[in-house]
Amino acid sequence: MMKIKKLALLCVMGICSQNLSAAEMAKNATDITASANQSVLKQLPFNDKQDFDDASRGFIATQTPLTIRDAQGNISWDLSDYGFLKGAAPATVNPSLWRNAQLNMNNGLFKVTDGLYQVRGYDLSNMTIIEGKTGLIIIDPLVTTEVAKAALDLYYQNRPHRPVVAVIYTHSHADHYGGVKGVVTEQQVASGQVTVLAPTGFMDAAVSENVLAGNAMSRRTLYQYGAMLPKSPLGQVDAGIGKTTSEGTFTLIAPTDTITRDKEQRVIDGVTMEFQLAPGTEAPAEMLIWLPQFKTLDVAEDAIHSLHNLYTLRGAEVRDASNWWKTLNQSIENYGSRAEIVIAQHQWPVWGQTRIVDFLSGQRDMYKFIHDRSLNLANKGLTMDEVAESVKLPDSLALKWANRGYYGSVSHDAKAVYQRYIGWYSSNPADLNPLPPVEAAKQYVDYMGGADNVLAKARLSFAKGEYRWVAQVLKQVVFADPQNKDARELQADAFEQLGYQSENPTWRNEYLMGAYELRNGIPDLPPISTTSRDMIKAMTPELLLDYMGVRLNTDKANGQHIRLNWQQPGGQQYTIELNNSVIIYEANKQFSDADATLKMDTLSFAKLVMGPTTMRASILKESSTITGDKVKINQLIDMLDNFPGMFNIVTP
């Protein structure tokens, strides 16, 4: 996932107050959409109920209703909103998506095998609990502390109350570590009572991924997860690999032990583990875990009951499909003949050696097919969009439920392969330096005979069910004149039908969020922070200085020259120089003629440059921490932009 880069948790932070109006404005499926969705029932093996058996197998207990609140009474997690997910799919939801959404409703404590349990449906991700000789080993403590604590409490209500002795992060996405302080304290880790284990590169990946482009990712995450949509057959029904993400307190405790070599082993509280490193697959830092005494392979998030993202719609660096299939192939080679259970940190397990190999090889072959076929077509001269339109999985892969596109899609994953190897440019000079969207839109509309003419033709296309084209052509009218209510309404209607037909819930959410904002405008919400106190504490000085450079308003900085020294208590030193409208820094160096010198740790420096004005004023008053010209420091910080949280997407 999902994954803080997006902080998945940020997509739903108290911003659903407008859901009622969204539900009231939503329209029903057209006859064309209803027919398209009905046809899906004939295309896929709906008689295969194995996933339903597996998803409910080993169920012990759950909380009813599953509503989790924080200390102030605010809701952190609530599955009761999804009570509508019963019976057959309505016309407004693709039946394949409806099936997956029902499967993801399985929630509670599940016994996987003796000594191995999972809590599912308490967040987007799963918490895996291993019973050691004296205590518990927690794998991936969910997104927020509130749900992580509730998940552990559920376990304790049904199993012996033993202390947590270790926490393992399988990878660097927020839904796999953010709730850590709900199961252990920082003091327990610092004292050595609890080990925190992670793959090499975890901290750098977990922090950096959410900082430099964090604001843009957070805004786009609202679209990917359908944050403003009501949970209903007309709105958000699922997130593909879970229902949605929890709201609450996001935390991070740094690892005390790191896996640096493939097949490295640990014995934790009597439990032997072997780790398969998988960097650059689903996350920059990731690992799979072989548990020989349980004959169980934890595949982290590299094999789930869906095609995963090679590119995530909220935005991120594209992932390496070649590395991904090779990782799964190595898993089959290493453990396929020994594994009797496969678990993942999303969704439900697979039991039985034959089924496991079939599941893993199906996932492996899917990623390799998308990789190879996309490049095959690119080498024949097809552009990115043409590649995405042309790549189709063979039925031997496409008819496996675990290979359906509930998170990634063949279309946008094929584009990711193209992007990774070739990039954005089609090589057609017409695409080299096109007019920007608004200017081009005005020209398009003028060439097409004006907005009224375009709208008249778009209405005819809508009536024929040509929703993709209607959405595409009306973008020009909306960008040429965002006040054109008729264009906005018709484009919203087209988005809506596309959403209703989408098998992929993230596509559905994207379309329905676009329709929502065309009809309602952009909600007036405060900027969404992508950093918590724990995240800021984990930032390296270099990352913090890089982020300053990203925030620099180059117009304000034009012609300015400022030189600062930064000295940390541990002896680290940096120079910071503003010149030519860029911030350049160097480690292990000091200016002899600096305008000012700051003597403070990274957290204090972060408060100075990222905190509110009142906090800055308080820090600047401390003569013991800053010497020299404080005006220069103020001038530099005043040049740093505070990014708008809710920038335009479907309008210019």
Ranges and model annotations:
Residues Q102-R162, M287-L291, K295-E301:
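Conserved beta-strand hairpin/beta-sheet module of binuclear metal-dependent hydrolase folds
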Residues T134-G135, T145-T195:
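Active-site metal-binding motif and surrounding structural segment of the metallo-beta-lactamase
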Residues M25-N37, L41, T296, S306, ...:
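Divalent-metal (often Zn2+) His-rich catalytic cores of metallo-beta-lactamase-fold enzymes
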